[in-house]
Amino acid sequence: MVLIRVLANLLILQLSYAQKSSELVVGGDECNINEHRSLVAIFNSTEFFCSGTLINQEWVVTAAHCDSTNFKMKLGVHSKKVPNEDEQTRNPKEKFFCPNKKKDDVLDKDIMLIKLDSPVSNSEHIAPLSLPSSPPSVGSVCHIMGWGSITPIEKTLPDVPYCANIKLLDDAVCQPPYPELPATSRTLCAGIPEGGKDTCGGDSGGPLICNGQFQGIVFYGAHPCGQALKPGVYTKVFDYNDWIQSIIAGNTAATCPP
């Protein structure tokens, strides 16, 4: 079974396939409190259901399938139960999606750019991660993180984000397990061929950081998480650099690559 890696309560995403419950990092360890300063928690009245990445003081990048009617974003958070003194909460002021995204197709151009209702300040636990200067190379070591499930089948949500290292794999590795993905999808394939480490339900929208650069957005994967030869699929940020920069510069009519 394959599912979008987001919480099951986002019912609008349930189309012809089963939706993947929110994903957590499976096979990882608790993140160091200072190693996820750009990680954004996206939450509603009941739970953290997605993550995002702060790319400057006013803008966050996440997955389009993380969109919801009412949500807030928390920055500088580590533990859900023990707040950091520098945590900041923001609402979305504007949300941008690829104008050429196929309607009602959650597998197409899964990226959302959010302008915050007010800028955030850099602090001990908050700092942006810039857009990538070049695309990643196969074999790169990549870092995943999130508050998603830490068990592959039953949902087990941690109080703190979990982190793990995986590798960028050749796109061909992701084609057999996910034939439903468009052939032209601008995505990355990343994981551990033998399985054991993966993003999971609740990790959707979070970053894939390869060699220190923000290269991917948690998008799609298998359920149970962490299966052998079924790595995760990530939206390829580098392919959307021009669109993101155009929107930030004020060109709201900018179009994403096909």
Swiss-Prot record:
Glycosylation sites: 44
Disulfide bonds: 31-163, 50-66, 98-256, 142-210, 174-189, 200-225
InterPro entries the record matches: Peptidase_S1_PA, Peptidase_S1_PA_chymotrypsin, Peptidase_S1A, Trypsin_dom, TRYPSIN_HIS, TRYPSIN_SER
Keywords, ordered alphabetically: Disulfide bond, Glycoprotein, Hemostasis impairing toxin, Hydrolase, Protease, Secreted, Serine protease, Signal, Toxin, Zymogen
GO BP annotations listed: proteolysis
Subcellular location: Secreted
Domain of life per record: Eukaryota
Record-listed E.C. numbers: 3.4.21.-
GO molecular function: serine-type endopeptidase activity; toxin activity
UniProt-annotated catalytic positions: 65, 110, 204
Keyword check for Glycoprotein: yes
Lipid biosynthesis listed as a keyword: no
Annotated tissue distribution: Expressed by the venom gland.
Residue span, Peptidase S1 domain: 25-249
Leader sequence segment: 1-18
Subunit structure as annotated in this protein's UniProt entry: Monomer.
Family recorded in the similarity comment: Belongs to the peptidase S1 family. Snake venom subfamily.
Protein name in UniProt: Snake venom serine protease catroxase-2
Organism encoding this protein: Crotalus atrox
